[in-house]
Amino acid sequence: MNNRWILHAAFLLCFSTTALSINYKQLQLQERTNIRKCQELLEQLNGKINLTYRADFKIPMEMTEKMQKSYTAFAIQEMLQNVFLVFRNNFSSTGWNETIVVRLLDELHQQTVFLKTVLEEKQEERLTWEMSSTALHLKSYYWRVQRYLKLMKYNSYAWMVVRAEIFRNFLIIRRLTRNFQN
């Protein structure tokens, strides 16, 4: 019976040190630096704007509210993964420099892998996050972005609308990183 309590205490000790092991200050710095790089790359993707192609994809309002630190990290990871998937689509009609798009994809991939590694130890919280309404709204939002591109046959005007939307995403991610402060 005593061994059982010792085992419970050991598990609690193990989980509490795991929970404290994420350095949120470092995570904040890393994310801000990487998002700035992505914004700079996105700004280099030029094209013509046609206001008739405007769309409101309705980003979930929860994304602008304060969340607990680990949920913020999961939200950022979800956003980066989906932005990566958006830019993997057929962008050939845009006339964009393929090298810049590849660099953007590489930067997004590196950030996603970094966050996945950092958050690996938070599997229980990940399950809770994935079932949350915020996560579901976020998935639905990116589905609307993908659907818009597909309906518009990936034309250059639609891509410029999506480019502007993704730029807003990066601004939201930068704002979310403030949650990593004490």
From Swiss-Prot:
Record: glycosylation sites: 50, 90, 97
GO biological process, one term: B cell proliferation
SUPFAM superfamilies given in the database record: 4-helical cytokines
Domain of life: Eukaryota
Gene null: resulting phenotype: Mice show impaired antiviral activity and are highly susceptible to vaccinia virus infection. Mice show spontaneous neurodegeneration: mice display motor and cognitive learning impairments associated with alpha-synuclein-containing Lewy bodies in the brain, as well as a reduction in dopaminergic neurons and defective dopamine signaling in the nigrostriatal region. Mice also show defects in adaptive immunity: bone marrow cells display B-cells maturation defects, and bone marrow macrophages show impaired myelopoiesis and lipopolysaccharide (LPS)-inducible production of tumor necrosis factor.
Residue positions where Phosphotyrosine is found in the record: 24
Gene Ontology MF annotations: cytokine activity; type I interferon receptor binding
Residue intervals passing through the bilayer: none
Subcellular location(s) of the protein: Secreted
InterPro entries attached to this UniProt entry: 4_helix_cytokine-like_core (IPR009079), Interferon_alpha/beta/delta (IPR000471)
Residues spanning the signal sequence: 1-21
Record's keyword terms, sorted: Antiviral defense, Cytokine, Disulfide bond, Glycoprotein, Phosphoprotein, Secreted, Signal
Disulphide bridges: none
Cellular-component GO terms for this entry: extracellular region; extracellular space
UniProt modification remark: This beta interferon does not have a disulfide bond.
Function statement: Type I interferon cytokine that plays a key role in the innate immune response to infection, developing tumors and other inflammatory stimuli. Signals via binding to high-affinity (IFNAR2) and low-affinity (IFNAR1) heterodimeric receptor, activating the canonical Jak-STAT signaling pathway resulting in transcriptional activation or repression of interferon-regulated genes that encode the effectors of the interferon response, such as antiviral proteins, regulators of cell proliferation and differentiation, and immunoregulatory proteins.
Family, per entry: Belongs to the alpha/beta interferon family.
Assembly and interaction partners: Monomer.
Protein name, UniProt field: Interferon beta
Taxonomic source organism: Mus musculus
